């Protein structure tokens, strides 16, 4: 495969972490009116349900440093994808689970953990696999992913809300809004198994030959040697 195309594909896969950041943050906006009616929430509880994901974001972001060192940038992104998937599935509260607003909050916090980890590890991973001259432009893919995520979830929640009656939206429409995140979450999870580990992390783990092999897949041989030397010197 062409090295440039391979690099772009790796970047796009990583940027899905940003897309899910935007999607998970935005989906609650479309669902909040209907789930508030369903659970008969007062203003305080509604605010807690909407804002609870931020608690997970904080914890996820704080934990991401040690996590990314322990299992790598790629491993951390896989964890975030699993958390996004669990949150998307659980926030819709499947019929075999007890219908509780507290349970919804738990799943929203789990999604927030995914956001916090992805917000730190996705741009870090992109920066560490990118050639120095292209690093800045490629990292912006992550920011673009966030905006695209917001836009897609707006379209999805609008479509679901418009094609159901208000009673249907209150009963199950809001569940479908949350479940719609399962698609991109599982896609992110699957694709992550096909991207390489961060060469910088591999160096930190003493796996220098493996790191150089990754660099050669992304860069021309001379550039790979230069970047490898820079990592060794840093």
What residue ranges belong to the model's regions?
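Transmembrane-helix signature of 12-pass secondary carriers
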Residues: 1-234
């Amino acid at each position: 495969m062409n090295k440039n195309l391979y690099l772009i594909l790796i970047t796009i896969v990583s940027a899905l972490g940003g897309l899910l950041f935007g999607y998970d943050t935005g989906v609650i906006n479309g669902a909040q009116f209907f789930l508030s009616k369903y659970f008969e929430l007062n203003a305080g509880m509604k605010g807690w349900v909407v804002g609870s994901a931020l608690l997970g974001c904080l914890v996820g972001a704080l934990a991401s440093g040690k996590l990314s060192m322990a299992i790598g940038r790629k491993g951390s992104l896989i964890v975030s994808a699993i958390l996004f998937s669990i949150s998307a599935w659980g926030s819709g509260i499947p019929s075999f689970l007890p219908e509780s607003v507290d349970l919804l909050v738990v799943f929203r916090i789990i999604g927030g953990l995914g956001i916090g980890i992805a917000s730190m590890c996705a741009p870090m991973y992109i920066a560490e696999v990118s050639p120095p001259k292209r690093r800045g432009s490629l990292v912006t893919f992550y920011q673009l992913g966030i905006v695209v995520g917001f836009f897609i979830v707006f379209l999805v929640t609008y479509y679901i809300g418009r094609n159901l009656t208000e009673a249907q939206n209150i009963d199950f429409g809001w569940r479908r809004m949350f479940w719609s995140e399962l698609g991109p979450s599982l896609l992110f999870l699957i694709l992550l198994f096909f991207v390489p580990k961060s060469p910088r992390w591999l160096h930190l783990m003493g796996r220098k030959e493996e790191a150089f092999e990754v660099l050669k897949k992304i860069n021309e041989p001379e550039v790979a040697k230069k970047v490898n030397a820079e990592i060794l010197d840093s």
